[in-house]
Amino acid sequence: LGIYRKTHIPDNHYYQEKFYFTPGDTGFKVWDTKYARIGVGICWDQWFPETARGMAVQGAEILFYPTAIGSEPILEVDSMPHWRRCMQGHSACNIVPVVAANRIGEEKVAPSEANGHQESSLIFYGSSFVTDATGEIVTQASRDKEEIVYGESDLDADADLRVSWGLFRDRRPEIYKS
């Protein structure tokens, strides 16, 4: 379909990607497929609302977010509900369905100089899901089983809903400064 390179690179105990990767410079892309105009935000990019809005402004009818995310057992918080709500918010604010795919399983972190010689593991919490255009979850996978989830959406009805809300009509990009 095309090339898009991950823009935001995480750097923490689990995801030390800045050591290995350079941020992408392609911007956020959308592609026309046989079924819909789609946008894809890889991993950490999905947490940034600018990613979703950038693709929606380009006409994305469905947003796809493939990722590998987990938080247990070292962190005292389960980040899965927060992750899910962020993706639901991207859907609701842009009136587009979201397909969020996450892996399951465990990765061991071997001691190294880069991680302070810590030994740990990371459990990926699965929970892949599909929303409708308003952010409502229509189907969701479990946390620990490999599963396929799917959903259906009436893209013409979604487009009508986007127009009726006026979110794109009433935007004021000339005053959005960083």
Task: Annotate each predicted stretch with a short phrase.
Residues L1-G2, I9-Y14, V40, F48-E50:
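Short, well-ordered, mixed-charge alpha-helical segments that flank or form enzyme active sites
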Residues P23-Q58, D158-S178:
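Cysteine/selenocysteine-centered motifs that mediate thiol-based redox chemistry or coordinate metal-sulfur cofactors
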Residues W31-K34, A133, S153:
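Active-site beta-strand termini and strand-to-loop segments that position acidic
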Residues G2-Y4, A141:
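Short hydrophobic alpha-helix segments
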Residues R5-Y20, K145-V163:
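A short, polar/charged loop-to-alpha-helix boundary motif
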Residues C43-E147:
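CN hydrolase (nitrilase-like) catalytic-core segments centered on the catalytic cysteine
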